[in-house]
């Protein structure tokens, strides 16, 4: 992996998203400005960490970061805008929620939303840039908790296990029980379950 070279600036925010692929729930984003004086060991892409490690880092990031913020786009916004534009909107909301304005923003992936400060997309940034790793952890822990809460309301779908992704089990239950109000109606499997597919 090529080592990432930081822009010459002080306040750098990292931004990442979780939940573009699921059929249900919001896409959740986070923006984080880390404190160089309070380093956090073990930051990595949230998908490469155990749940226990993620939860511990989640608390440490919230405690030690100079600023952090969550953003989201709800299922109805995803359906209205499409998932890419909804993700960009959620990222803008996360950056806008920071109580310290960053001088530069690093975004995981290959596209940047329009922001009031310079920004750069970093491919595989969640493994290369600690600020993005921290954002990925905050976003994933938050979204996983939302799926666990939804699982209590709709236990038949298994949301706590698959987090809303289109697993065989989820698709089977979608066909059996239909869609909840939290499902993304613009996504193919949900459309088919609702009989809306053309």
Curated annotation (Swiss-Prot):
Gene3D superfamilies: Ribonuclease H-like superfamily/Ribonuclease H (3.30.420.10). GO terms for molecular function: manganese ion binding; RNA binding; RNA-DNA hybrid ribonuclease activity. GO terms for cellular component: cytoplasm; ribonuclease H2 complex. Keywords: Cytoplasm, Endonuclease, Hydrolase, Manganese, Metal-binding, Nuclease. Residues 10-198 form the RNase H type-2 domain. Endonuclease that specifically degrades the RNA of RNA-DNA hybrids. This is Ribonuclease HII. It comes from Shigella dysenteriae serotype 1 (strain Sd197).
């Amino acid at each position: 992996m090529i080592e990432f070279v930081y822009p010459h600036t002080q306040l750098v925010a990292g931004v990442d998203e979780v939940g573009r692929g699921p059929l249900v729930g919001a896409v959740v984003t986070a923006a984080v400005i880390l404190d160089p004086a309070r380093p956090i060991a073990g930051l990595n892409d949230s998908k490469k960490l155990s749940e226990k490690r993620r939860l511990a880092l989640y608390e440490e990031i919230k405690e030690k970061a100079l600023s952090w913020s969550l953003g989201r786009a709800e299922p109805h916004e995803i359906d209205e805008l499409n998932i890419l534009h909804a993700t960009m909107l959620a990222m803008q909301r996360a950056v806008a929620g920071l109580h310290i304005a960053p001088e530069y923003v690093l975004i995981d992936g290959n596209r940047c939303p329009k922001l009031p400060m310079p920004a750069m997309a970093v491919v595989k940034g969640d493994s290369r840039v600690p600020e993005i790793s921290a954002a990925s952890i905050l976003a994933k822990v938050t979204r996983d908790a939302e799926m666990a809460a939804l699982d209590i309301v709709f236990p038949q779908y298994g949301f706590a296990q698959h987090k809303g992704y289109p697993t065989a089990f989820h698709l089977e239950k979608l066909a059996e029980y239909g869609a909840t109000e939290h499902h993304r109606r613009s996504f193919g499997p949900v459309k088919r379950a609702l009989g809306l597919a053309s």
